[in-house]
Amino acid sequence: MEAAAELQIPVLVLDRPNPIRSDIVEGPLLDLNFQSFIGKYPIPIRYGWTVGELAQKIVAEQWIPAVPSLSVVSMEGWYASLWYDETNLPWVKPSPNIPDVGTALIYPGMCLLEGTNVSEGRGTDHPFKWFGAPWINGKILSQELNKLHLPGVVFVPRSFTPISIPGVADKPKYENQLCDGIEIRVITRNKYQSINVGVSLSLIHI
């Protein structure tokens, strides 16, 4: 939109659903002192808006240096509590490591751990659902996490070996090394709190 504004080109957004519902919001607002390419606006981690609603908010709040002429074509037959897999629309990966709605739900919390020395499952068939490292005891970690009784989720021990996958995971953490850890198994997605899970994982000491 910034480039369109600079070139005086109108922007037309054909709105699409937020894949993990629009009526659930999680996480703190971004501190703009830590603004980056992956976090640009003062919005929660799981912000809930559709792409059209986000575009309208960016323009209304003037979060970019120049704002374009924006038009949003609204959806029909959509409501905020719909999951993407309830829309009958084909799934298009928003990222190579988000292959399905289940991963999209888990991602907002697990992405907080990408900068750590623990594998977030890249280089496996279950990115962000698996979490571990060669020095972790998955049995103990799963037991400690399950003691927290976090809503909508159970944690089970999981061993895995990350590998490079062309176009998906290039030299992932602990490539070709056996990692022990946990699998995040969502059992009630309407109750699952992604950010709470990510923060809880980061605070566990084993």
Segments (PLM) and residue ranges:
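Active-site-proximal cofactor/substrate-binding loop regions of enzyme domains
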Residues: 1-2
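A short helix->loop->beta-strand "cap" motif at the edges of active sites that frequently abuts
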Residues: 6-10
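Glycine-rich, charge-decorated loop segments at or immediately adjacent to ligand/cofactor-binding or catalytic sites
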Residues: 12-34
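Active-site-proximal beta-strand/loop segments in catalytic clefts of secreted hydrolases
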Residues: 14-17, 75-76, 133, 187
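Conserved anion/nucleotide-ligand pocket segment
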Residues: 35-107
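Glycine-rich, aromatic-lined ligand/substrate-binding cores of catalytic
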Residues: 77-158, 162-163
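Substrate-recognition/cap regions that form aromatic- and gly/pro-loop-enriched pockets
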Residues: 150-200
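Conserved small/polar residues in nucleotide/adenosyl-binding loops
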Residues: 204-206
